[in-house]
């Protein structure tokens, strides 16, 4: 199943978090926080103004992004857990 976001929504794949701390301690799965970094998998066309004019998206597929801890809605696509969020939930692009 392919999923294309609508309007100003973005589909994001979370990046994997570190398995160890800087001191070498292994972090168990139960103690790991979900990462707030990810890669844009797909984007909608963008939002529209009241006049109907399209507002272009600031992110594109493949961008590494930073988003809020509680951003987005978890969705499962082809057995993979992804996040669907509005572009405004994205804090920035990692360059």
UniProtKB/Swiss-Prot annotation:
<dbReference type="GO" id="GO:0051082">
    <property type="term" value="F:unfolded protein binding"/>
</dbReference>
<dbReference type="GO" id="GO:0005524">
    <property type="term" value="F:ATP binding"/>
</dbReference>
<keyword id="KW-0963">Cytoplasm</keyword>
<dbReference type="GO" id="GO:0005737">
    <property type="term" value="C:cytoplasm"/>
</dbReference>
<dbReference type="InterPro" id="IPR020818">
    <property type="entry name" value="Chaperonin_GroES"/>
</dbReference>
<dbReference type="GO" id="GO:0051085">
    <property type="term" value="P:chaperone cofactor-dependent protein refolding"/>
</dbReference>
<dbReference type="InterPro" id="IPR011032">
    <property type="entry name" value="GroES-like_sf"/>
</dbReference>
<comment type="similarity">
    <text>Belongs to the GroES chaperonin family.</text>
</comment>
<dbReference type="GO" id="GO:0051087">
    <property type="term" value="F:protein-folding chaperone binding"/>
</dbReference>
<dbReference type="GO" id="GO:0046872">
    <property type="term" value="F:metal ion binding"/>
</dbReference>
<dbReference type="InterPro" id="IPR037124">
    <property type="entry name" value="Chaperonin_GroES_sf"/>
</dbReference>
<comment type="function">
    <text>Together with the chaperonin GroEL, plays an essential role in assisting protein folding. The GroEL-GroES system forms a nano-cage that allows encapsulation of the non-native substrate proteins and provides a physical environment optimized to promote and accelerate protein folding. GroES binds to the apical surface of the GroEL ring, thereby capping the opening of the GroEL channel.</text>
</comment>
<protein>
    <recommendedName>
        <fullName>Co-chaperonin GroES</fullName>
    </recommendedName>
</protein>
<dbReference type="GO" id="GO:0044183">
    <property type="term" value="F:protein folding chaperone"/>
</dbReference>
<dbReference type="Pfam" id="PF00166">
    <property type="entry name" value="Cpn10"/>
</dbReference>
<keyword id="KW-0143">Chaperone</keyword>
<comment type="subunit">
    <text>Heptamer of 7 subunits arranged in a ring. Interacts with the chaperonin GroEL.</text>
</comment>
<dbReference type="InterPro" id="IPR018369">
    <property type="entry name" value="Chaprnonin_Cpn10_CS"/>
</dbReference>
């Amino acid at each position: 199943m392919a999923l294309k976001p609508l309007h100003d929504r973005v589909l994001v794949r979370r990046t994997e978090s570190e398995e160890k701390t800087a001191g070498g301690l292994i972090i168990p799965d139960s103690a790991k926080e979900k990462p707030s970094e990810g890669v844009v998998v797909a984007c909608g066309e963008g939002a529209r103004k009241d006049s109907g004019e399209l507002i272009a998206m600031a992110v594109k597929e493949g961008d590494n992004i930073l988003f809020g801890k509680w951003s987005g809605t978890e969705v499962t696509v082809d057995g993979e857990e992804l996040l669907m969020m509005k572009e405004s939930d994205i804090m920035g692009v990692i360059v």
